[in-house]
């Protein structure tokens, strides 16, 4: 790789950040991390998994204390509810409330369904390659920082 290509890769990352900023505005007090958490919880439930904070943390590759804080905020705002396991009182499961389901429907399902036809010029292979490259680049930059 050349220095110029590294610069172009960083420029592409900036464009990706700008594309994220073009997502629809969220309601007051709702962060993008709420939307990600709702999405992960629903995906895990679809796979037959009763989601826990540790599942969110592992899936999103985020530290548990931050995820715990976000879950508490979401519960306080009425998007999630927690339920202690009947079998093991140390385990707490996460469930979307009606408000959480509506929020996820609007900002996950509906928005991305509307966006889908505009992206048909990007092949699944190109998208997968971009994702893989950005993940590798992020890992390299993170390791270099440590």
Locate the predicted segments by residue:
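Alpha-solenoid HEAT/Armadillo repeat architecture
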Residues: 46, 61, 101, 105, ...
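Terminal interaction helix/tail motif
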Residues: 109-146
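N-terminal positioning helix adjacent to the helix-turn-helix/winged-helix DNA-binding module
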Residues: 5, 33-37, 52, 99, ...
């Amino acid at each position: 790789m050349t220095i110029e290509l590294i610069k172009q890769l960083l420029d592409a990352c900036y464009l990706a950040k700008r594309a994220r900023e073009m997502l629809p505005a969220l309601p007051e007090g709702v962060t993008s991390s709420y939307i990600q958490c709702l999405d992960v919880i629903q995906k895990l439930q679809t796979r037959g998994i009763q989601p826990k904070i540790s599942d969110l943390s592992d899936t999103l590759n985020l530290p548990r204390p931050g995820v715990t804080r976000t879950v508490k905020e979401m519960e306080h705002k009425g998007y999630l509810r927690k339920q202690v396991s009947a079998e093991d009182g140390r385990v707490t499961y996460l469930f979307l409330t009606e408000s959480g389901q509506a929020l996820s429907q609007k900002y996950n399902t509906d928005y991305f369904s509307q966006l889908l036809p505009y992206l048909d010029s990007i092949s699944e292979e190109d998208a997968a390659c971009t994702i893989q490259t950005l993940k590798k680049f992020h890992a390299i930059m993170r390791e270099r920082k440590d």
